[in-house]
Amino acid sequence: MMYQRLILTFLLFFSVNVFSQSKDQILGKWLNASGEAHIQIYLNGSKYFGKIAWMKTPNNPDGSPRLDKNNPNSSLSSNSILGLVILKDFVFNDNIWQGGSIYDPKTGKTYSCKISLQGPDKINVRGFVGFSMLGRTESWTRVK
């Protein structure tokens, strides 16, 4: 009887630890799916944000920095893509970072987004319009 309780306690403890995630596990640098950029995810107040911290090709062929030329807000189109905040306003809820948005500097479009942890070094980033079923998911890996 005591042996069964010990096993049950162990299994209960183990299952809770496996399925619970710390809200700050997402913090750090992540390599995007294309391998073109590192995104630094950080906490600002109670929300999570992400900015482009490194780019494989940060400059144009003429040596000038790549700019956010496709931004629909003309006052922002002269900003450098390096350092650009592309993930905004995420909150942690039910093991998912949600309620935020992702900006794509290649198209100048912003999408609703949610992020889920797939392991200590992998996240799935899902951008969508309207319903999350209508979107695209990318896997990002942690930069070590």
Where are these regions (language model features)?
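Bacterial N-terminal signal peptides that target proteins for export
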Residues: 1-7
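Edge beta-strand at a domain terminus
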Residues: 120-122, 130-144
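Generic beta-strand structural signal
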Residues: 43, 92, 117-118, 142
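Acidic, glycine-rich flexible loop segments
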Residues: 104-120, 125-126
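N-terminal signal peptide c-region/cleavage motif recognized by signal peptidases
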Residues: 15-17
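Short acidic, glycine-rich loop/turn motifs
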Residues: 32-34, 102-106, 127-131
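N-terminal helix-cap/turn-to-beta initiation motif at the start of protein domains
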Residues: 19-29
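Central antiparallel beta-sheet cores of small beta-barrel/beta-sandwich binding domains
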Residues: 27, 35, 42-103, 110-111
